[in-house]
UniProtKB/Swiss-Prot annotation:
ATP binds at L13, S14, G15, G16, L17, D18, S19, A20, T21, A22, M23. Keywords: ATP-binding, Ligase, Metal-binding, Nucleotide-binding, Queuosine biosynthesis, Zinc. The lineage of its organism: Bacteria, Pseudomonadati, Thermodesulfobacteriota, Desulfobacteria, Desulfobacterales. It comes from Desulfatibacillum aliphaticivorans. Gene3D superfamilies: HUPs (3.40.50.620). InterPro entries: QueC, Rossmann-like_a/b/a_fold. Its cofactor is Zn(2+). The keyword Ubl conjugation does not apply. Catalyzes the ATP-dependent conversion of 7-carboxy-7-deazaguanine (CDG) to 7-cyano-7-deazaguanine (preQ(0)). This is 7-cyano-7-deazaguanine synthase.
Length: 233
């Protein structure tokens, strides 16, 4: 029996492909999963319905949806009236930080996860960041996670008292999108329940052309697995 089988873990769950896989990995490691999602004013609120489906299917002990309003700051195509880039080549995605980057989003999300982890008296947090097939986000890099972990252990009661050491698990950080999909399939993830698109139709269909959709399509193609996503015709 896994030594950490009964430990709790907070998993950041957007409803997308990566976070669903991270949650499945946490479950496979034996953790009791507490899923945390955010309604932050994002244009792609369809992902919240996906998060609810994934949390239920993968057996989260509890699923919290925190309401925060990042539209008051704007600064991103996901939270303001800015166009979402379409049709970009993968190499172009890596040249600059895109307008779909939400300022400090992962720092905000991880801070909420850290607070909940303290309440749950656990030191384990999972986040599905990826530094291989990614859209140039600065808060998806290993050095960012290392820095946040160091801060977390200085900023929490448990960390200061030396009772536990906060650990931020990033099981996908060195995997390609294809490898992530293959890992998820092996763990029984139903990717038909997930949603990745930044600019879906009113009916919730994926646009097929934003960075997130293109990376998703590329991942399924390279993994040799049919893409279950419903795209706009």
């Amino acid at each position: 029996m896994n030594a950490i089988q009964k430990e709790k873990a907070v998993v950041l769950l957007s409803g997308g492909l990566d976070s669903a896989t991270a949650m499945a990995i946490a479950k496979d490691m034996g953790f009791q999963v507490y899923a945390l999602s955010f309604s932050y004013g994002q244009r792609h609120t369809t992902e919240l319905e996906a998060a609810k489906r994934v949390a239920k299917t993968l057996g989260a002990v509890e699923h919290q949806v925190a309401n925060i309003d990042l539209t008051c700051f704007g600064g991103s195509a996901l939270t303001a009236d800015l166009d979402v880039p379409k049709g970009r080549a993968p190499e172009d995605m890596e040249k600059e930080i895109p307008v779909t980057y939400v300022p400090a989003r992962n720092t905000i999300f991880l801070s909420f996860a850290l607070a909940w982890a303290e309440v749950l008296e656990t030191s384990h947090i999972f986040i599905g960041v990826n530094a291989v097939d990614y859209s140039g986000y600065p808060d998806c890099r290993p050095e960012y996670i290392q820095a946040f972990t160091a801060m977390a252990n200085l900023a929490t009661k448990a960390g200061v008292e030396g009772r536990t050491k906060i650990e931020i698990h990033t099981p996908l950080i060195d995997l390609t999108k294809a490898q992530i999909i293959q890992k998820g399939i092996a763990l029984g993830v139903d990717y038909g329940l997930t949603h990745s698109c930044y600019d879906p139709s009113p009916e919730g269909l994926a646009c097929g052309q934003c960075d997130s959709c293109l990376l998703r399509k590329k991942g399924f193609a390279e993994a040799g697995i049919p893409d279950p996503t419903k795209y706009i015709p």
